[in-house]
A protein has these predicted regions:
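Beta-propeller-forming repeat regions
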Residues: 20-770
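Positively charged n-region of N-terminal signal peptides that target proteins for export
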Residues: 1-6
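Bacterial N-terminal signal peptides
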Residues: 8-19
Length: 770
């Protein structure tokens, strides 16, 4: 065994030291490294961390040792004169540290294979604790008791936790100055454990996310002194998503940043200030890039429109077939708010719009379970809107409104004979108070029930052939006679129109939609011909048609009343023949008489802006790429200015048509000078003592460390590089892992100069800085 250990040490020994000159970056500092120190531990050690565990002013090393089901703690003994390990008669086992080593190795047992480890103070006592998560799905905290003592494990079982070193993060995420814990889950949410004022950890709560991120990080992206939550999906064309921390310690919506797919990343204040930079390695090219987060005015779009910041708000995941989601003013302040049903928990989440156009954090109120539809209107014109909720689970329609204390009381069910299947609310005649319209089912017989705020109710039986369940009920004057009608959308069926007659009753007609029936029907309304009247917008795959319901030509000699048909007034095409338009919204652009039209193209993941040209023909003006398309509808909404809002089952989003935007601005890139080299990972740290940080790339094709300077001009300047080992000389090196696989930059020699600590094969290498 001793011979094998010596052989391994010999083949890894590099004669002499290394010197790195940063003169090319106009920096005069020189730094170099003496020959490396080698500390064998075990195969497959991982999760390298550096921290002063025992408070002696010296940095210690921590690694996960899953082969032995333990976490190894390497206590730093540099300069200590009271050591007890300098002489021993004990025979050294393989990978034992010899007497006189810089580190004394200790360990803590684990009851699981640890996937992620963070070393940080999570109880406010100033001592770094151990936070880890593994295959037993237990988030575990071992508190540092000082004097090399550790608490018993405190665990939280989290079945959906992701088994990945990048899935765990620690930092102050709610602005109270205390470190919190975040664990990325595979179920659409982050498990968040806030540190409380008594320094205990609260029970986990979920922070929803969109997409399928593989990593999280807590860091200050925008330099405002507050930590933000970063999501990374390496293989996505928008790998980086950020939720900025806003007032009150809340997290804002997600902002997506577009780059190429990446294999690794590093976020750091490379210039020594508060500005965070992103260093990433592009998957396709292996080229390293450095970018900066910048705030810029939105680019012009068309007319008064500018392309603002698309913001995505993930909702609590729901597996219900449908859930109620609506943009509407619910507190009477004239601003559109967001109301979201939580079908499984029987709650209503309300996001009130603030004066600056942002949404406050959600307030939850109890309501009916299984709410699938929501409607809002000031039913009695008292200035306080009512919220109407339809629950098929409870076979009820109920109403509630905010009280003077800002509370939403439990909804009051409305008297109803039968099962409600669709509802809408709005004025049926010009100037009238809103009427609640409900389609109900009583033992297979469908009826229309209308109810006003004073309790007046009417019921009208509908056709016996009406058996299918509608997805949408809309109040809209489809024949432009000044009386509001009811439009019922049913998958794979004709459009059912309840035409209002002068006596207030409704004529039930079924009309073929232009282009045929649809699997997922939808509609919108807009004046697209400029005559001051609103047309119905109906989709036909790659275009929408503006239609008006008109009587069909009467057949000569026929005695029946003429049938009804949709007459096409105009057509607006998407950007391509294979476009799939699933939503449309109109927004007034400056002083234009006819509003602009936005089409949601799900096939191309685009929002298409269309406008009428001088000849009155609709043209595509601009296609805006969307990082997320899991939405089912769009509409115009005012959020401190004009915006297009998106709604979906588990997320909503909005695109302001103005304002400033965050962008990821690329500063420079770097191709390794190592022939056929493969940059796999990167870390950063200050190796000169000047405040600016250098980059250390782990090159795993030829097993090099590749050092690069980040210059004051924002450029990546090549420095020194050396081979950590030669693959063919290393015994048992075929472990399938990239080498060198982890690296840290910290002072472990006690001379106030940062050293290089590298994890390779079964050992830790330390390159002391000269």
């Amino acid at each position: 065994m001793n011979r094998c250990s010596k052989f391994i040490i010999f083949t890894l020994t590099v004669a002499g030291g290394f010197c790195f000159s940063t003169s090319a970056a106009s920096v005069t500092n020189l730094f170099g490294f003496s020959g490396k120190e080698i500390y064998p531990i075990d195969q497959q050690i991982s999760n390298l961390h550096v921290a002063d565990l025992d408070g002696d002013g010296l940095n210690d090393l921590i690694v996960v040792n899953n082969l032995r089901s333990k976490i190894n703690l390497l206590y730093n003994l540099t300069g200590k004169t009271n050591r007890t390990d300098t002489a021993t008669t004990k025979k050294l086992e393989l990978n034992d540290l010899p007497p006189g080593s810089r580190f004394r190795i200790d360990s803590l047992p684990t009851e699981q294979r640890v996937a992620a480890l963070i070393v940080a103070d999570v109880n406010g006592d100033g001592r770094p604790d151990l936070v880890y998560f593994g295959d037993a799905k237990d988030l575990t905290v071992r508190y540092n008791l000082g004097t090399n003592g550790w608490s018993e494990p405190k665990t939280w079982h989290l079945d959906s936790g992701r088994l990945d070193p990048n899935a765990l993060a620690v930092g102050d995420l709610n602005g109270d100055g205390l470190n919190d814990i975040a664990l990325l889950g595979d179920n659409g949410a982050v498990h968040f454990l806030a540190q409380q004022k008594d320094h205990t950890l609260a029970e986990p709560v979920k922070i929803s996310y969109s997409g399928t991120p593989k990593a999280i990080q807590i860091t200050d992206i925008d330099g405002d002194g507050k930590n933000d939550l970063v999501f990374v999906d390496f293989d996505s064309p928008t790998p980086l998503r950020v939720r900025l921390q806003i007032a009150g310690g809340q997290l804002g919506p997600e902002i997506y940043f577009k780059t190429q797919p990446i294999r690794s990343f590093w976020l750091d204040t490379l210039a020594g200030g508060t500005t965070n930079f992103l260093v990433d390695i592009v998957t396709a090219t292996g080229r390293a890039e450095v970018s900066q987060f910048t705030r810029q005015p939105a680019e012009p779009l068309a007319g008064k429109f500018k392309q603002g910041q698309l913001q995505i708000l993930p909702l609590n995941k729901s597996t219900a077939g449908t859930r109620g989601v609506l943009w509407a003013d619910v507190n009477g302040d004239g601003r559109a708010d967001l109301i979201v049903a939580e079908p499984e928990s029987g709650q209503l989440s309300v996001y009130l719009q603030q004066a600056d156009g942002t949404l406050a954090s959600a307030k939850k109120f109890p309501c009916l379970a299984g709410v699938s539809q929501i409607a809002v209107a000031d039913w009695n014109h008292d200035g306080h809107p009512e919220i109407f909720l339809l629950s098929r689970d409870e076979n009820a329609v109920a109403v509630t409104q905010f009280d003077k204390n800002g509370r939403l009381p439990f909804p009051t069910p409305l008297p109803l004979d039968g099962k409600p299947i669709a509802l809408a609310v709005g004025a049926l005649k010009p100037g009238a108070k809103p009427t609640l319209a409900i389609i109900v089912d009583v033992d297979g017989v469908r009826s229309l029930v209308t109810r006003t705020a004073d309790g007046k109710t009417t019921t009208q039986k509908l056709s016996d052939s009406f058996k299918s369940n509608p997805t949408t009920l809309v109040i809209q004057d489809v024949n432009q006679d000044g009386l509001a009608d009811l439009v019922v959308l049913i998958p794979y069926e004709k459009i059912k129109v309840l035409l209002q007659k002068k006596d207030g009753k409704f004529e039930e007609v079924d009309v073929d939609p232009p282009g045929g029936v649809m699997e997922q029907p939808w509609l919108a309304a807009a004046d697209v011909v400029g005559d001051g009247k609103t047309e119905l917008l109906l989709p036909q795959k790659n275009f929408v048609r503006a239609v008006v319901l008109e009587p069909a030509a009467k057949i000569p000699g026929a005695t029946n009343a003429p049938a009804w048909k949709f007459t096409v007034k105009d057509q607006i095409n998407g950007s391509a023949s294979d476009s799939r338009i699933v939503g449309a919204a109109t927004v007034v652009n400056g002083t234009n008489t006819v509003p602009s039209l936005f089409l949601f193209d799900a096939e191309h993941k685009q929002l298409t802006l269309c406008e009428r040209d001088a000849a009155g023909v609709w043209q595509v003006v601009k296609n805006l790429d969307l990082p997320v398309t899991t939405f089912s509808a769009i509409q115009s909404v005012s959020l401190g200015g004009a915006a297009v809002a998106f709604t979906g089952q588990n997320s909503v989003a909005w695109l302001p048509l103005g304002g400033n935007v965050w962008k990821l601005t690329r500063l420079d890139d770097y191709d390794t000078l190592i022939k056929n080299g493969y940059l796999n990972d990167v870390v950063a740290g200050d190796l000169t003592g000047g405040g600016r940080k250098q980059l250390v790339f782990m090159e795993t094709g030829k097993n090099y460390l590749d050092l690069v300077q980040f210059s004051a001009a924002g450029k990546l300047v090549p420095g020194d590089r050396w081979q950590v080992f030669e693959q063919h000389t290393f015994r048992n090196s075929q472990n399938g892992l990239p080498e060198p696989r982890e690296c840290a930059i910290a002072d472990v020699t006690g001379d106030k100069k940062n050293d290089l600590i590298v994890l390779v094969h079964d050992r830790i290498l330390v390159y002391p800085q000269e």
